[in-house]
Amino acid sequence: MERIFNPRQFGALGDGITLDTKAIQAAIDEAGIAAERGAKTIVVLSKGIYLTSSLFLKSHMEFRMEEGAILLGTTDESQYPIMHTRVAGVEMEWTVGILNVNGQEDVKITGKGCIDGQGPYWWNKYWGEDRKGGMRKVYEAKGLR
């Protein structure tokens, strides 16, 4: 049996202004529960701009982004959790990305939508506006290149 979960049914607005992380994650979590019970689950992001931070996909699900759906990563750094990880061979605490599939299996990310992580913001944060400062100095001190 196939079950569709639309984050709008969980309160997502898709207006590009409201932070929709909790609503999208709620849809993902419900899909995960249904998948554990044997259902084929699909989380469908319909047309809209969904401002979000980190999302954690579950096993045995499809995350489908329809044409015109944009998953827009927030630049509010306080919204991203920090996890212990390894970056360039160095153990450290690091912020989590937008879409995460940790310890899960049989996960599909499909569709014609777009994931926009707002790269220029993070690029400038790393290099600094003057291309000499920024977070690069912090990373280099930890042995990252």
Predicted regions and their residues:
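Extracellular/periplasmic carbohydrate-active domains that bind, remodel
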Residues: 1-145
